[in-house]
Structures are given as C-alpha cells and as structure tokens.
From Swiss-Prot:
It comes from Homo sapiens (Human). It comes from the Eukaryota. This is Beta-1,3-glucosyltransferase. The chain crosses the membrane at residues 7-27. The keyword DNA repair does not apply. The gene is B3GLCT. Residues 1-6 are cytoplasmic.
Length: 498
C-alpha cells in the first residue's frame, strides 16, 4: 500500500498502538568514458598508491535475506569473495550477511546497523562495501578502484541513479530538477568510508531515526547521508557496473530471472484480483486484454456480482481505502477450497499489470512448504521497532503454508477498511515470519523508476494506469517474448550454481 498523505489521521488508535530490459548501459557511454578517463588519470597520478589498502581493510556486507533461497545465494557470494582473497594470498576480509547481523526487524534498512559497524570495524578497516546477493565482484579490480579514494575522508561511493521526472515513490523530491540528486544502484555495490560511518553514527546517537515509511531504501539512504547539504553527495564510480562483464568493471550484475527447477505450473498458482463495481468497466477489460490468459486459476473479487466477468461477491462492502476485510476473506476462501490444494496465492489490484509466466520462473526457487510472503518490501517505523510489509499494488505472493499459519493465528483486521498490506505485515512480524523482498515487483509505473535501474531487471509487475497506456506498458515490459526464451541458457548456468 502507498501510504496516504495524511495516513495518521486515518489510522485508529488500535493500529497506532501496534506501530512502535531494454536500455543498455551503453546509452550513457559518453559519461562513462569521461568517468573512466578521470579514473585512469587518477591512477597515473600516483594517488592510488598513496591510498594503499589491502583486503583486510574492506568489510563486505551482503544485503541478504533469511529465506532459504536467498540465504544460499548470499553464502555462495561469500565463498566467492573469500576464495578470491585466498587466491591473492591476502588475509581474509570480513564478509557479513545482513540477515545474520541482527534480529531486529529493520536491519535491512542498514542505517540502524551503522553504530555496530563503527564500534566493531573503525580501528582496523577503511571501507564498508555493500552489495546484493547477485552482485558479482572482481576483487583485484575493486581494490584498485578503492585505492583512488583517500580513506581518511568521508566518501559515499556507488553507481549513480537519478529520477527522470518527479515521482511519487520519492515524494516528488527535487521536483524542479529531479536529475540533480544522485543515489546508488545497490545491484552494482556501494561503499562508505569509515570516517563517514563514524560521522553518521554520531548523528544517529544524537537524533533517532524518524518513525515513518521506508519505500525506496537506496534513495532514502542517499538523502540521509546528504543531509540537505551537510553531508557528502554520492560520488559516481564507473567501475561499479550493472551491465555485462567489461574490462573496467569491479562489479557486475546479470539480468536474468532465477530458475532453480522447472517453472511452477500455472495450475499451482491461484490469482485473486481485488476490484469493485465502479472499476468493472474500465480496469477489468485491461486485465482481460493483457495478462488474464496467462493465469490458469483466476477469480475477481468484488462488492457486486457481474456474471459477464465473472465476479465473486465475498459479502464484504467496498471501502475507499484499505480493503483488509476483503483480503482476509480471500485468504480464507483460498485455504478452505476443498477441491484443490493450490501451492501459491497471488493477490493483485485491478490496476496491477503482472507477468504470470515470469512469476512461474521466480517461484521455482521458493518452497511452498515454507511460509513465504513475497513481493516488494516496504517498512513502517523500522527505526523504532516497527515492521516490514509487502506493498499490495505490485502484487502479494503467499505460499499455502504462510496462509495457513496466518489464519491459524488470532491476527485479523481491526476494521474492513484497514490497510490490508500493512496489517498483513504486522501479523507476519508477530508470527516471526519475515517478508521476502523481490525488486522485480513494482508498486508504481515504469516511468517512476530510473531507466538505468530497470535496464538490468526482468520485471514481474507494475502498478497504476494513471497517465499511461496500460496495454502498451504490458506489451512493452511484461508480455512473454523471445527475449525471455533467450534467457534460458543463462538460467541453466544459474541452476548449476545452485
């Protein structure tokens, strides 16, 4: 759910009490060439030798997750880093898995962990280097790159992204010129010098993190570090890459959908579309023109029975916001269907655009016997003991076991119009079941994300029809294509790694 501007006026005290493909890298080749030349000039000047560091001076933090698939991928990356270090006959660096560092709900937001990094590593380390589990690192090149930057100074390094236009997911920040503010693409890796970590730690101790929403972490971290000009902006590093392997890249990131086994069968995925009478005429036809035919099991849940669609009236009155009552009725109906034991449930809005075929591939990496709650992760109040949740617009994916455990608990909506995705997040948090994040689900439209960010993704969903042609968006970004088939060879290699 995208939080409304005055959400706190809408939430009752009961809730408040609980709240404590496409564009290649080469399109920017001129800028990249300039950056690489500047890098090479720095190396020729001898600056890199002055800032000599070894691997022991770098602390690697893999932004991992506790789900078994993600934890395994992170462990494989850790082994790769340590093997490369051993091959260089250097003392092995510290390689940390984020999900193992702290039990607190908000560890994935990273800022709450900076004091730990400061206390533990500031004496003997120069850099904290963060990366995703699918980031690939060339350790010798990374060392060469970091040696260009004086580790006694405050540095915030990464591959720079910027908004193409003011966007709702960033609260329309820098609306006069959205391109001016740069933030890191986590997939390429990003780094903080220890002096900057120490400075941020002092700030965190003097002023606690605000208890509000975490929507796009990479943008929010960059804003916090920049501190309205009081801190350093992001320094773009051309060797931090998300394109295919190139001679100058210290990091790379491959664009493919995970495929661990055979794709999950369509009959094992039940799709529930939330709608209401007022949208039967404009939104439902879009679903039928685009992705409905991909779904083997699909039902439309409404406040009004219309046989031509057809819709199912769950007996829950429509609400202008929240839809918690409707969502929990869908969960009950899914679990209690006597004729089948479908492994997966997907709940989407009637203005969600989704690729079922790509979802089939992705779900091959997850065990429906585990409690899996998957989608795009947001957070609420994570600086003060809040919770994470899967935002509903991009689609919420549940394993049958997750639904079973949820409904076996006493956690329910406090009202029919409560925000369903946030209530689900609270419930799963209370059950000790972490949400699983996939950046391939999107709460907003393609135009709301940087082109360079989407260029290394195989997206599964987008959301909202506002000011776009949703049919064109679907066939441009999500429809099954020959390009999807061409990725099979890459995916075979991925399966072999697993």
């Amino acid at each position: 759910m995208r939080p409304p501007a005055c959400w706190w006026l809408l939430a009752p005290p009961a809730l408040l009490a609980l709240l404590t493909c496409s564009l290649a890298f080469g399109l920017a080749s001129e800028d990249t060439k300039k950056e690489v030349k500047q890098s090479q000039d720095l190396e020729k000047s001898g600056i890199s030798r002055k800032n000599d560091i070894d691997l022991k001076g770098i602390v690697f933090v893999i932004q991992s997750q506790s789900n078994s698939f993600h934890a395994k991928r992170a462990e494989q990356l850790k082994k790769s880093i340590l093997k490369q270090a051993a091959d260089l006959t250097q003392e092995l660096p510290s390689v940390l898995l984020l999900h193992q560092l702290a039990k607190q709900e908000g560890a994935w937001t990273i800022l709450p962990l900076l004091p730990h990094f400061s206390v533990t590593y500031s004496r003997n380390s120069s850099w904290i280097f963060f990366c995703e589990e699918e980031t690939r690192i060339q350790i010798p090149k990374l060392l060469e790159t970091l040696r260009r930057y004086d580790p006694s100074k405050e540095w915030f390094l990464g591959k720079a992204l910027h908004d193409e236009e003011a966007t709702i997911i960033h609260h329309y920040a820098f609306s006069e010129n959205p391109t001016v503010f740069k933030y890191p693409d986590f997939a390429a890796g990003w780094a903080l010098s220890i002096p900057l970590v120490n400075k941020l730690t002092k700030r965190l101790k003097s002023e606690s993190l605000k208890s509000d929403f975490t929507i796009d972490l990479k943008h929010e971290i960059a804003l916090y570090i920049w501190d309205k000009g009081g801190g350093p902006p992001l320094t773009p590093v051309p060797e931090f890459c998300t394109n295919d392997v190139d001679f100058y890249c210290a990091t790379t990131f491959h664009s493919f959908l995970p495929l661990c086994r055979k794709p999950v069968k369509k009959k094992d995925i039940f799709v529930a579309v939330k709608t209401c009478k007022k949208f039967h005429g404009d939104r439902i036809p879009i679903v039928k023109q685009t992705w409905e035919s991909q779904a083997s099991l699909i039902e439309y849940y409404s406040d009004y029975t219309e046989n031509s669609i057809p819709t199912v009236d769950l007996g829950i009155p429509n609400t202008d916001r929240g839809h918690c009552g409707k969502t929990f009725a869908i969960l009950e109906r899914f679990l209690n269907r006597s004729q089948d034991k479908t492994a997966w449930l997907v709940i989407v809005d009637d203005d969600t655009l989704i690729s079922i075929s790509r979802l089939q591939h992705l779900l091959s990496c997850y065990d429906s016997g585990e409690p899996v709650f998957l989608g795009e992760r947001y957070g609420y109040g994570l600086g003060t003991g809040g919770y994470s949740y899967i935002t509903g617009g991009g689609g919420m994916v549940f394993s049958r076991e997750a639904v079973r455990r949820l409904l076996a608990s006493k956690c329910r909506c406090y009202s029919n119009d409560a925000p369903d995705d946030m209530v689900l997040g609270m419930c799963f948090s209370g059950l000790g079941i972490p949400v699983t994040h996939s950046p391939l689900f999107h709460q907003a439209r393609p135009v709301d994300y940087p082109k360079d960010y989407l260029s290394h993704q195989v997206p599964i969903s987008f959301h909202k029809h506002w000011n776009i042609d949703p049919v064109k968006v679907y066939f441009t970004w999500l429809a099954p294509s020959d390009e999807d088939k061409a990725r099979q060879e890459t995916q075979k290699g991925f399966r072999e790694e697993l």
